[in-house]
Amino acid sequence: LKCHNKLVPFLSKTCPEGKNLCYKMTMLKMPKIPIKRGCTDACPKSSLLVKVVCCNKDKCN
C-alpha cells in the first residue's frame, strides 16, 4: 500500500507491514487543507476540530 505522507499530494511512501490504511486529517473549518497524512493500522477518531478520513487503496488520501 502506498499513502501520501506529506501535505503536498504528490509525495507518497510505501507503508510498513501491518499499516494497511491511509489517513488524512483536516480541520473541520477548513476541509480543503490537510494537516496530516500517512499510514496507520487503525483509523484515528475524528474530534470536534479535526476530521479524519481513512481508506485502503494506493494514494487514496
Curated annotation (Swiss-Prot):
What's a GO biological-process term for it? killing of cells of another organism
The subcellular location is: Secreted
Which PROSITE patterns is this protein grouped with? SNAKE_TOXIN
* GO CC field: extracellular region
The protein's job, in short, is: This protein lyses red blood cells and has cardiotoxic and hypotensive activities.
Q: State the family it belongs to.
A: Belongs to the three-finger toxin family. Short-chain subfamily. Type IB cytotoxin sub-subfamily.
Other comment: Is classified as a P-type cytotoxin, since a proline residue stands at position 31 (Pro-31 in standard classification).
Indicate what this protein is called per its UniProt record.
Cytotoxin 1
The record lists the organism as: Hemachatus haemachatus
